[in-house]
Swiss-Prot record:
Identification of the protein by name: Myoactive tetradecapeptide
GO biological process, one term: neuropeptide signaling pathway
Phenylalanine amide: residues carrying this PTM: F14
UniProt source species: Amynthas vittatus
UniProt superkingdom: Eukaryota
Protein function: Has a stimulative effect on the contraction of gut muscles.
Length: 14
């Protein structure tokens, strides 16, 4: 969500 902006929820851009 924050770093990358992919299929995440809070702060996981994976």
């Amino acid at each position: 969500g924050f770093r990358d902006g992919s299929a995440d929820r809070i702060s996981h851009g994976f």
